[in-house]
Amino acid sequence: MTAATRGLPGLGAFSRFHRDARLFLLASLISGAAISLWWIDFNLYLQALGLARATIGIVSVIASVAGTLTAFPASSLSDRVGRRTVLAGGAVAGLAALVLLLAAGDNLVVIVAAAGLWSAGFQAISVVTAPYMAEHSEPEHRNELFAVQFAIQNVTNIVAAILGGVVAGAIAGALGFDPAGLATYRVIIGIMIVLMVIGLGTITLLRDDRPRTQQSPRLQRLGEPAAFPQDPRRGRARFGIVVRDRGRFVRLILPGFLIGVGAGQVIPFLNLFVQGRFGLDLAQLNGVFAVTALGTVIAILVQPRLARRFGQVTSVVIVQACSIPFLMALGFSPVLWTVIAAMAVRNALMNAGNPIFSAFAMEQVDKAERATLAAATSVTWQIGWVFGGLFYSAMQAWLGFDLGYAVNFIAIIVLYTASTALFGWWFRGAGRSR
């Protein structure tokens, strides 16, 4: 093991991850590049089609609603047919959405349908990701596995920026199209289709994990039962959902809801914000997102060490609280390089807490409740994005670009502060520090 590897504990533990965990990380890298391309370029594509910012916000809201409606059914289904099947189904839905979007042209109804289908597929994958990793990792390696997976998500942002900003433009130029025109976005969609096909193929290599499949004896000795333990109340619960401690559930998901409301006003539309304020072209804009993702990768990989030093809860509170001043700079600085720096540091700090929070949350509930918690977290996040997206659209329609974004940034700062304070207060003293 090299000194660099020792400095990044997630990478040092990679060889000790389960075979399926390593395959899942590979699938995350491949399909995650397609997902990142969607988040970076989808709104820009709609703007290139001539849609107003308020209309783009409504498309985002409808997509969030579709994701919200998918989360609990996907969670319940995964308990019956296995996480792998739901992962594959989500990838198939995403692939179908891309094909539909490519064929849609400027038909708004078809575009909305494609966005909804994509969001549904993405949510199906999201709600089973944390339970799948928890069920394919040993307790002493869980923080590292979650950290590496989150870091991979940000590596894919860098890959996506290169594919979207350089490769797609070069391909479009070679074919005689305008590198800044609609054809380049359609090349990006084609690249996404290829990535999703490869990602789906990787998912099919995962071992069968339907309920009849048992966990390894070693995990059972460590107190980790089968991935799908039988709960005598499950048959009586609505949609197969079992929640033993509702108060704890609320405390785990409410901070995320507040962040979701704030994030829904800004994060999906950061590409439009940066482009509109500074006039960047497609390649430059993708480059900005690549730079911001790089710092996040490093921060996420060192977060397990922070968790061991300060404890899971304290480390999450520290990095999230430190990110808030950079939100202020991001929203209100008139200088491009300070906005890029603020975006990079803010992303690094805020996202660095995500893998540790996910691991912490999975450990706060019984094994049979993990998928339910993941679904509840996803649903409340998506509901937050619905409210946030509606508020964004209203502000853009009523106040215009500058004042509308100013109100949105003030709101996200207040909500992030409240969320961080509540999480720290409710869970002070909880969580592992080793």
Locations of regions flagged by a protein language model:
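Juxtamembrane intracellular "pre-TM" segments in multi-pass secondary transporters
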Residues: 2-18, 208-254
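Helix-loop boundary and gating motifs at the non-cytosolic
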Residues: 8-66, 248-289
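Hydrophobic core of transmembrane alpha-helices in multi-pass small-molecule transporters
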Residues: 29, 97, 108-125, 257, ...
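Helix-to-loop junctions at the C-terminal end of transmembrane segments
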Residues: 70-82, 168, 299-312, 396-397
